[in-house]
């Protein structure tokens, strides 16, 4: 089974330990390190205590996140093979011109190993910080075009007139390290995002879904590529998934029933809950894009957790013994998964 394996980069201080861990991951043979680009974590303040998780003894807040690009630079400059990427950032907080410059700089620091993971964004990183949460997918679509234009600008001036971004006599004199620009991977789930992935991206990084849904979504990506005449021979279909490993079924079931894991299931799209016969826990049309943990009282935390049965956790994470996980991942490989 030919499949790459990534690992999460450390997101909390001390950063020197995070750098050492990244170097160790390369020695262990991992193919990539990935960092989320968050200002706020997914777990509400009201549930971050030792009763909920032992992590609270060592981490006073659930909202500790170092800057991913700084960690990518530090580790990328001290390694030779492992790739470094964001999983993911957005173009609501970060302007596409700044992203293009940052990624080209990282391209040189890592000698071509930096990956820009992009998504449409989540309100928890946007609205509480005074940034407008409006038309995130439309802004991503335009921003992708702007990034590509600037990364390929050479010494030419660039003009672009969009609804959300505008360039006039813009320049980006920094060339890529090698003969191609840094790769862009999209965290896509819905039809429009999947189409954008086929049109612009070099890789795909969704959260876990069934092998059947993965295969169907990958087909949509290829359809999007064909519509613009793109060749996806070097495209990398990936997936972001948690691993819950235990020696036996009983220990795995305890992990699946834990409040910490069940709370993370809010990251799944509403259609996944519906496909499992479970009402979306946030109610109505609200989904994880609308979730702002710093505003969730404890009684609402309890309600959400109770609304997420362990069978949902089993769908969200790769859970089982080592042998079971190998078998499950093989089913995704058959559906097209390569990272």
Predicted feature locations:
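N-terminal beta1-alpha1-beta2 module of alpha/beta enzyme domains
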Residues: 1-78, 82, 182
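Hydrophobic faces of well-ordered beta-strands that scaffold small-molecule active sites
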Residues: 3-7, 33-35, 84-86, 114-118, ...
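Active-site mouth loops of central-metabolism enzymes
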Residues: 4-16, 87-97, 178-189, 243-245, ...
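Structural motif
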Residues: 28, 109, 199-200, 335-337
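Short helix-capping segments at alpha-helix termini
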Residues: 28, 79-82, 109-110, 154, ...
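Conserved, mostly hydrophobic/aromatic
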Residues: 29, 37, 75, 106, ...
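An alpha-helical appendage that flanks or caps ligand/catalytic pockets
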Residues: 134-175, 212-334
């Amino acid at each position: 089974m030919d499949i790459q394996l990534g690992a999460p980069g450390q997101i909390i201080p001390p950063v020197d330990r995070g750098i050492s861990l990244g170097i160790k991951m390369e020695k262990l043979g991992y193919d990539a390190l990935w960092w989320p680009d968050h200002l706020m974590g997914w777990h509400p303040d009201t549930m971050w205590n030792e009763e909920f998780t032992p992590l609270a003894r060592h981490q006073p807040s659930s909202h500790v996140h170092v800057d991913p690009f700084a960690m990518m630079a530090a580790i990328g400059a001290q390694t030779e093979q492992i790739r470094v990427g964001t999983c993911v950032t957005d173009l609501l907080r970060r302007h596409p011109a700044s992203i293009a410059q940052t990624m080209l700089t990282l391209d040189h620091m890592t000698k071509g190993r930096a990956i820009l993971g992009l998504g449409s964004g989540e309100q928890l990183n946007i609205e509480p910080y005074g940034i407008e949460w409006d038309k995130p997918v439309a802004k991503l679509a335009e921003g992708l075009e702007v990034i590509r234009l600037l990364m390929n600008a050479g010494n030419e001036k660039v003009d672009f007139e969009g609804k959300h971004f505008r360039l006039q006599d813009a320049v980006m004199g920094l060339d890529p390290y090698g003969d191609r620009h840094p790769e862009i991977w999209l965290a896509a789930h819905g039809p429009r995002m999947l189409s954008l992935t086929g049109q612009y991206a070099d890789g795909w990084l969704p959260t876990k879904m069934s092998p059947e849904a993965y295969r169907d979504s990958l087909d949509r990506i290829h359809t999007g590529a064909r519509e613009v005449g793109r060749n996806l021979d070097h495209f990398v279909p990936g997936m972001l998934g948690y691993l819950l490993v235990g020696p036996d079924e009983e220990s795995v079931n305890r992990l699946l029933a834990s409040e910490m894991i069940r709370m993370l299931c809010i990251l799944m799209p509403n259609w996944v809950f519906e496909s499992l016969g479970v009402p979306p826990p946030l109610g109505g049309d609200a989904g994880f894009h609308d979730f702002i943990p710093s505003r969730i009282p404890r009684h609402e935390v309890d309600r959400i957790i109770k609304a997420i049965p362990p069978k949902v956790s089993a769908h969200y994470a790769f859970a089982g013994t080592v042998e079971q996980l190998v078998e499950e991942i093989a089913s995704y490989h058959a559906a097209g998964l390569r990272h």
